[in-house]
Every structure is written in structure tokens, then in C-alpha cells.
Amino acid sequence: MATASLVPTSKIFSVSPKSSASIKARSRVVVASSQQQQQPRRRELLLKSAVAIPAILQLKEAPISAAREVEVGSYLPLSPSDPSFVLFKAKPSDTPALRAGNVQPYQFVLPPNWKQLRIANILSGNYCQPKCAEPWIEVKFENEKQGKVQVVASPLIRLTNKPNATIEDLGEPEKVIASLGPFVTGNSYDSDELLKTSIEKIGDQTYYKYVLETPFALTGSHNLAKATAKGSTVVLFVVSATEKQWQSSQKTLEAILDSFQL
């Protein structure tokens, strides 16, 4: 009959003092090696984080600066002629057309509690400068209680083949607004909507001024406009309001229109 002997497990799994020391030494080497490998990785991650943080901050700030979603009184100077308004003077950094030299710098006053609106890239002319075939929007400002204003620019060649034509070269005020009317209303233009026209001279520059009642316009039931031509561009300044806005802010809106000039 076969017999089985039991061998103490402590002897099988026992580790000699020399082996134990060797294992500990190897463990220290492995740990040290792992730490050395991790250190460059940590440094790399820290460097990436240092670069990424300012970028994230810029992304958070960009929408505010791009849309200027603050009241214009917080960053525009007071108008010298009337301190109840602030003065907006367009600079080359403001629009693609100004940077390209297609539009001469312009200016107008605004109440200090108005805000600048963001303009979609496709409407800003950014994609077609310096030679745009279609009109584009330069800048736009708004106050929900008073109304909105926008500067629209159109290539002169849409209205005449004469280089450097003046606004007078384009015809009488009624003829010019017939071409530019849809850019005032946002949809269509009917000559019956035109209430009044006038001609203004500021220095060497002539402006056509319009008062329109536009019940079906997308921009509002009341529109004021001022048009002039210089270089290769016709510039149209539009002041729009709903019936409620017009009733409370007519004089303010008229003052804004009168202030516009190249």
C-alpha cells in the first residue's frame, strides 16, 4: 500500500534571506525606472496644460469681444457735439471691407445703452473681399426698446458702370432708393412706402436721405436711410424701428441718422 508524505509548505514557499534582498533590490529598480518614465510624461502633461489654459480662457472671452455684447457706452467715447450720445468711428480692424480699403471710414452716434450685434460671416463680406459682387453688412447695433441701425455696402458697379461715381451720378433720390430699397426693408420695396426724400451736403460728400413707412418690412414698420457713394462702393445707413419703438424714440433715431457721415 502506497503512502504519502506531507511536506511542510513553509519550506516550499520559503525565501532565503539572499533571495529576499535580491527581490527587494529589483523592486526598487523597477519602481525607480517607472518613476523616471512617468516624470517626462508628467512634465509633458503639465506643459500641455499650461498651453491649453490660456487657449481655453481665450475661447471663453472670444464670443464677448467678437459680438461686443456690452453697452457701447462702456467702450466708446462721448460725442463731442452731444454728450448724451457716444461716437462710433469705424476702423480698419472693425470690418473686412475697411481692411481691404473698399469702404471709407464712417462714423455715427449712438445712445450709450445700445449694443453691437454679431454679423454672420456670409453676410459680412469677409469671404469676397476685396472684390465683392453682392452687398454686405458692415456693422449692426441695437437696443430692444429703441430700434436698430446697420451699415450696408454695395459694389458701385451694381448701379453704374461709371468709375468713382458720386451719388448724384446714380440719379435722383427716388431712383437710387428703388435699387437699394430691399436692403432697407430686408425683403421688398414699394415706392408707395417712401414718405420723404432730401439731399444733404457735408463737405464734398453728398447724401440722399429717406423716410419710409414699411408695414411689411422685416426690419420694422419705420425705416430711415441715408445713402452716399465714394470710391467703388455705395454706402447705405439704415435706422429701423417697430411701431412701439418709433413712438417712444423717433427723435433719437432721427438724430442717429443725421449723424452718419463718411
Curated annotation (Swiss-Prot):
Gene Ontology molecular function: calcium ion binding
Disulphide bonds in the chain: C128-C132
Pfam families named in the record: PsbP
Keyword DNA damage: no
GO biological process: photosynthesis
GO cellular component: chloroplast; chloroplast stroma; chloroplast thylakoid; chloroplast thylakoid lumen; cytosol; extrinsic component of membrane; photosystem II oxygen evolving complex; thylakoid
Keyword Transferase in annotation: no
InterPro entries membership: Mog1/PsbP_a/b/a-sand (IPR016123), PsbP_C (IPR002683)
Cell compartments where the protein resides: Plastid, Chloroplast thylakoid lumen
Keyword vocabulary terms for this entry: Chloroplast, Disulfide bond, Plastid, Thylakoid, Transit peptide
Family, per entry: Belongs to the PsbP family.
Role of this protein: May be involved in the redox regulation of photosystem II.
Protein name: PsbP domain-containing protein 6, chloroplastic
